[in-house]
A protein has these predicted regions:
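Hydrophobic h-region of N-terminal signal peptides that target proteins for export
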Residues: 11-20
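Boundary of Sec targeting at the N-terminus
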Residues: 19-22, 39
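Short active-site neighborhood of thiol/selenol oxidoreductases, capturing the structured segment around
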Residues: 44-64, 86, 176
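Structural microenvironment flanking redox-active thiols in thiol-disulfide oxidoreductases
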Residues: 64-112, 123-128
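Thiol-/selenol-based redox modules, centered on thioredoxin-like
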Residues: 141-201
Length: 201
């Protein structure tokens, strides 16, 4: 009987958590997180600047598509050159695919030529669950007033093939261009694709 009750409770909680995930055109959920280099940062630290959140897992084929081609690094560098804050988030739990400590995260970024503003370590999955991050990559764009204006895939082609990048619609690039121009993001919510975020139990 207890097991049945627990199952029913889980079924009731799951939709509530999904509904509580970050919503487009609403204030982005506030957070504080540890960085790979031992600092602590909060979303509030970047008030007045555009922020990108990128969920990542270096072992995921879909992530390797974008890093192996240089696409993710190019987007990071182009965005940060315009003053955008780019926060890479690792929500893989210890023992799960993609889990790394701070030193390993920094080494991976150096080896791949990645250029995020900071890498946030989220081994308990609190930040990932707060935003409803489902896949790696899963992308979010927050405009300077703190409003979430985009969430979803990095682009329109849900494959692990590097050759598809050139013909895909670059959703994140388009969202950032719209924010910079003071326009509404036309495709504000798209389907994320990639490996599931490897949360702990």
């Amino acid at each position: 009987m207890k097991m049945i009750r627990r199952t029913l409770l889980a079924l009731l909680i799951a939709p509530a958590l999904a509904h509580a995930a970050a919503a487009v055109d609403a204030p982005a959920p506030a957070f504080t997180a540890a960085t790979a280099d031992g600092r602590t940062v909060s979303l509030a630290d970047f008030k007045g600047r555009t922020v990108v959140l990128e969920w990542t897992n270096h072992d995921c084929p879909y992530v390797r598509k974008h890093y192996g081609s240089g696409n993710m690094q190019s987007q990071q560098k182009a965005a940060t050159a315009q003053g955008v804050v780019w926060l890479q988030v690792i929500s893989s739990a210890p023992g799960q695919q993609g889990y790394v400590d701070g030193a390993a995260a920094a080494r991976l970024n150096a080896e791949r030529g990645a250029a995020p503003t900071a890498t946030l370590l989220d081994p308990k999955g609190d930040l990932g669950r707060l935003y409803g991050a489902q896949t790696t990559p899963h992308m979010y764009v927050i405009k300077p007033d703190g409003t979430l204006v985009y969430k979803g895939g990095i682009d329109s082609l849900a494959t692990a093939d590097k050759a598809d990048i050139a013909r895909a619609e670059p959703y994140v690039t388009e969202a950032l261009a719209a924010v910079a121009a003071g326009r509404k993001v036309e495709k504000a919510s798209t389907r994320p694709y990639g490996c599931s975020v490897k949360y702990g139990g």
